Amino acid sequence: MENLVIKERTERTQWYCEARFGMFIHWGLYAIPARGEWVRSNEHMPKEDYDKYFDEFDAKEYNPKEWAKLAKKAGMKYAVLTAKHHDGFCLYDSKYTDFKSTNTPCKRDLVQEFLQAFRDEGIKVGLYFSLIDWRHPDYPHFGDTHHPMRLCEDYKGTDHDFDNYLGYMHNQIEELLTNYGHLDIMWFDFSYDDMNGEKWKASKLIEMVRRLQPHVVIDNRLEGSGETAGSIRTLNPTPYSGDFDSPEQMIPPEGIRDEAGNHIPWEACITLNRHWGYHAHDNHYKSAKLVVRTLVECVSKNGNLILNVGPDAKGRIPKKSVAILEEVGEWLADNGESIYGCGYAELPKPEWGRFTRKRQ
């Protein structure tokens, strides 16, 4: 008898496993210092120092219609935007915090505009939401693996009401699922150490997600990240195991299968250069040829590719990124039949490339 979680996962991901190619967009306050999205953690930056970027954020050239047209031209079938990253800054008008785009000089609900623009182009839409929040006072500070203040003795012995934080987190997710229309993907990030599964009250959370938007496809990072994928690879996955596995910056050598050897949905999330968020001096871009080869390899192994771009502080996707994506789109215009709706061909890999097969 088929496991109900697996059965529902298969039904939900039918469109997703045909789409194959998506756009990831990491954008937030960290685009202002322009040293990557982990700048606050990497530099142990105090909240007060980071706040100056909040006061500067105007996103004057943000035009999501241009982003959406670029994604369509590149042949991307879905797109995911960081509604909130680890720094806790919301690109939408959350009623649970003042740390949001509508309170910056920008004064815009950037998520709402993104969703409308991409829907208008016929592109499926998703939102990334960080389970981690370095802004919230009740998220663990001292001794945490990643928090900017993890080594700051001032926070040693500080009591944090983690249940209060979880209430805040769940409320914000409920906002996104309630106030922003039909979402195709919710991309949670991430679990680490003992911060996984029921530490996030994942059963309660997933019940809410499925009640509000039963169709929405979610990743596996409520339970595991990276090599610790969680129970999605087993024959008895938890209800919060996710609908797809999410290897980062790599392609699994043989794709991803469960314990019985059955293919499970997966998506390689890969950056176009070496950072997710905008980095002014990162010019290590992948060529369009390499992007195409990466996409073909993913599809040949029954997986998706979500390729990341990091807009600058004004809301502009770097020109180099635009040029690469347009070139990839030219290839897909001629060869998309070998990508969309295709997967593992059940044939040995040839010396000259890869096989894909259209799903019947």
Segments from the language model and where they lie:
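Mature catalytic domains of secreted/periplasmic carbohydrate-active enzymes
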Residues: 1-360
